[in-house]
């Protein structure tokens, strides 16, 4: 292991300790954050920022979310839908999908920006991660592969995309930030036999969800 690899490993461990202090308690989630090399999802000139607890721009008006945000969303999903097939809306850098893959999910991910989708797909291949990628309008989901045990939306929606709700399996969970531009409430919907149960959590700030059932 060279000096840079040792430094990145040290910073990744520091990041996980900070997540623990911030209230992330699920050991499966913490182990996934320790195993996935977050710096691989940054361009080389930006890797020094990979383990800081902040969002970072990745081009095309998109960002890689701060570690705490990723950990919070992941914990909400794992608690309710601990295994199975999951769909991510908004591939971005690919980091969130990689965390889900490390947790043992079968992962499908959709990205609106073709260039980001292609970049993430190449990185997944290089890392040996079997993650299914496509580009397109994520608000419409992936009907050919539905139903999903979990769906995670990594952009701020004005309301819950109805199409995604109906691509959930029974007892499946949808994690989505809902609200105005710049500030949303993390929201979880769980599909029951005759209804959808809804839970609302803390405030977060995401880039807008663009699509037919998003911000247009």
Curated annotation (Swiss-Prot):
Primary location recorded for the protein, binned into one broad class: cytoplasm
PROSITE patterns noted in UniProt: PCMT (PS01279)
Record's subcellular location: Cytoplasm
GO molecular function annotations of the record: protein-L-isoaspartate (D-aspartate) O-methyltransferase activity
Catalysis: reaction(s): [protein]-L-isoaspartate + S-adenosyl-L-methionine = [protein]-L-isoaspartate alpha-methyl ester + S-adenosyl-L-homocysteine
GO CC list: cytoplasm
Function: Catalyzes the methyl esterification of L-isoaspartyl residues in peptides and proteins that result from spontaneous decomposition of normal L-aspartyl and L-asparaginyl residues. It plays a role in the repair and/or degradation of damaged proteins.
Family: Belongs to the methyltransferase superfamily. L-isoaspartyl/D-aspartyl protein methyltransferase family.
Protein name: Protein-L-isoaspartate O-methyltransferase
Native organism: Chlorobium phaeobacteroides (strain DSM 266 / SMG 266 / 2430)
Taxon lineage: Bacteria, Pseudomonadati, Chlorobiota, Chlorobiia, Chlorobiales
Gene name per UniProt: pcm
């Amino acid at each position: 292991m060279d000096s840079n690899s040792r430094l990145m490993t040290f910073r990744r461990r520091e990041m996980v300790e900070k997540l623990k202090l911030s209230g992330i308690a699920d050991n499966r989630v913490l182990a996934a954050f320790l195993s996935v090399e977050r710096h691989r999802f940054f361009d080389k000139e930006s890797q020094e920022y990979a383990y800081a607890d902040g969002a970072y721009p990745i081009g095309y008006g998109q960002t890689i979310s701060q570690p705490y945000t990723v950990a919070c969303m992941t914990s909400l999903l794992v608690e309710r839908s601990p295994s199975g097939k999951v769909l991510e809306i908004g591939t971005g850098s690919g980091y969130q999908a990689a965390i889900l893959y490390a947790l043992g999910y079968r992962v499908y991910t959709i990205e609106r920006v073709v260039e980001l989708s292609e970049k993430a797909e190449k990185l997944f291949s290089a890392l040996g991660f079997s993650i299914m990628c496509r580009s397109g309008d994520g608000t419409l989901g992936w009907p050919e592969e539905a139903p999903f045990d979990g769906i995670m939306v990594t952009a701020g929606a004005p309301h819950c995309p109805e199409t995604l709700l109906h691509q959930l399996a029974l007892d499946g969970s949808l994690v989505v930030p809902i609200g105005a531009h710049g500030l949303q409430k993390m929201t979880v919907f769980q599909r029951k036999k005759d209804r959808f149960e809804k839970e609302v959590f803390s405030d977060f700030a995401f880039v807008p969800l663009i699509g037919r059932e998003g911000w247009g």
